[in-house]
A protein has these predicted regions:
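N-terminal secretory signal peptides and thylakoid transit peptides that target proteins
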Residues: 2-19
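N-terminal glycine-/serine-/threonine-rich beta1-alpha1-beta2 phosphate-ribose binding loop
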Residues: 31-167, 175-182, 188-190, 244-292, ...
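An acidic- and aromatic-residue-enriched active-site/binding cleft used to recognize and process polar
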Residues: 44, 131, 172-173, 197-200, ...
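A contiguous active-site-proximal alpha/beta segment in oxidoreductase catalytic domains
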Residues: 151-152, 161-243
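Contiguous beta-strand/loop segments that form the cofactor/metal-binding neighborhood of enzyme cores
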Residues: 221-224, 234-351, 355-378, 387-391, ...
Length: 447
């Protein structure tokens, strides 16, 4: 890795004094093409909204530019980031620092970044991270991140160049389901390998449960401890990752109801969602059940909410907020014929949620190198719709909302090899100081 960085710097330095190339864009394009031939690693454009400490751009890119731990092993990214685009430049922006350290040019537009300064697509994959930054919030409480705008501008260059390369979209596809649906339809039309979604489903499971393919899941619950919408998304991705291979595969959602505050307790009391499942999920994390969704020992009090989904095939599933903890990701389900619920807690590793992105980076890099998504983007398409509809349902809590547009069916291949198995946290432990810089924490003896 070090020699490749030195090669890149050397080429850029040499080209910088070559009079034949009279523009910086031509210089960058030629340098990148030379390095592509010598390095033979997929060339990646990184497009992001904001790059500050612990932002998604930070915690993903630190595992793209250096080797990192995955399942306890030093892992080479296997790709080369050759261009950067930032949509905003807030205080604490890390773009220039990283650009200078790694010799990666920063471009003023998305088009320039994916063309690496030239006039046609010049990368083998695109990393789109539209998370964090100063963007407006609509009347439903949805942060209007420009994921669709990023997507449209990236794909426009692919169309013009008649070259279609793997694309990753961080988190949900869009705050608008119609846009999310259009994005997936476009990638299908042009055979663009498309991956999206959350880091949490790839986390270590404690206990390390597995749900057999074809299991007859009757009811499920996914619990988080964060804000409405932004953390509901991750809980939905956890939910789908656990239930999508049930008997018959995914069938989609026909109805949802949003409950908030006292409504949550009433819904639990009358059996709208299964309290035994909630207890099992919380016990997986804490070792005991709880009595109050809104106030846990050592945590600030919050107003709980629950989103109950009725699936086309009869499954019922609930997203439940419990307490205030950014690292709370718990799941439980009831399988027909089993006496006790099956439950687990998703352990994020040390340093809050930062280390979650090692496994996600590994999945994205696998996607870029193989040219095919390791798990279906339809999961995130369905989740995008479930989340958008939930925010609509929140405007009339306690009242069912029909979701005929979410009858989305899909099946997911086995991708368990892409999940963290916990061995990394034997090397990076809870006692390991978190780096306060662009540094993924790879132990010194492995560098």
């Amino acid at each position: 890795m070090t020699s490749q960085k030195q090669t890149r710097r050397a080429v850029l330095k040499t080209l910088a004094v070559t009079p034949v190339l009279t523009s910086l864009s031509a210089l960058d394009s030629w340098a990148a093409s030379i390095l592509d031939e010598t390095g033979k690693r997929p060339r990646v454009a990184a497009i992001y909204t904001s790059f500050t400490y612990r932002s998604h751009a930070h915690v993903l890119l630190e595992n793209f530019l250096e080797p990192y731990l995955f399942c306890g092993k030093k892992t080479d990214p296997g790709v080369e980031v050759v261009s950067l685009y930032r949509d905003q430049q807030p205080a604490g922006d890390m773009t220039d620092q990283v650009s200078n350290k790694y010799g990666i040019p920063v471009y003023r537009t998305i088009r320039e970044a994916v063309c690496v300064g030239g006039d046609k697509l010049a990368v083998d994959a695109v990393l789109s991270i539209a998370e964090h930054g100063n963007y407006p919030v609509n009347d439903r409480g949805q942060r209007m991140y420009p994921r669709k705008r990023f997507f449209d501008q990236i794909v426009a260059v692919m169309k013009e160049s008649n070259k279609f390369v793997p694309l990753f979209n961080d988190k949900h596809l869009s705050y608008r389901f119609d846009w999310a649906n259009e994005m997936v339809a476009t990638t299908q039309q042009y055979n663009i390998p498309f991956l999206a979604g959350s880091s949490v489903p790839l986390a270590e499971r404690k206990p390390a449960i597995e749900i057999k393919k074809g299991a007859r899941i009757v009811q499920a619950i996914s619990i988080h401890g964060g804000p409405v919408e932004s953390y509901d998304f991750h809980a939905l991705e956890v939910l789908q990752s656990m239930i999508e291979n049930r008997r018959g595969g995914e069938t989609g959602v026909k109805r949802l109801t949003f409950y908030e505050g006292d409504q949550v307790y009433q819904a639990a009391k009358v059996g709208i969602f299964d309290m035994e499942l909630a207890d099992a999920a919380m016990t997986a994390e804490l070792g005991h059940s709880i009595k109050d969704f809104g106030k846990l020992e050592g945590e600030d009090e919050i107003t709980p909410h629950a989103i109950v989904y009725d699936y086309v095939d009869g499954l019922k599933a609930t997203i439940l907020r419990v307490g205030k903890s950014s690292t709370r990701w718990n799941f439980a389900c009831r399988i027909k014929g089993s006496a006790a619920p099956l439950a687990t807690s998703f352990y994020v590793g040390p340093w809050q949620n930062r280390n979650l992105f090692k496994a996600l980076a590994h999945s994205i890099q696998t996607h870029f190198r193989n040219g095919s998504a390791p798990y279906p983007v339809q999961r995130t398409l369905l989740v995008s719709g479930m989340l958008d509809s939930a925010m609509q349902g929140r405007l009339a809590t306690g009242h069912p909302l029909q979701t005929n547009h979410l009858h989305i069916s899909y099946k997911s291949p086995d991708h368990s090899a892409l999940r963290e198995n916990g061995d990394s946290w034997k090397l990076i432990t809870e006692a390991t100081p978190e780096p306060e810089r662009f540094d993924n924490g790879l132990p010194a003896n492995l560098k």
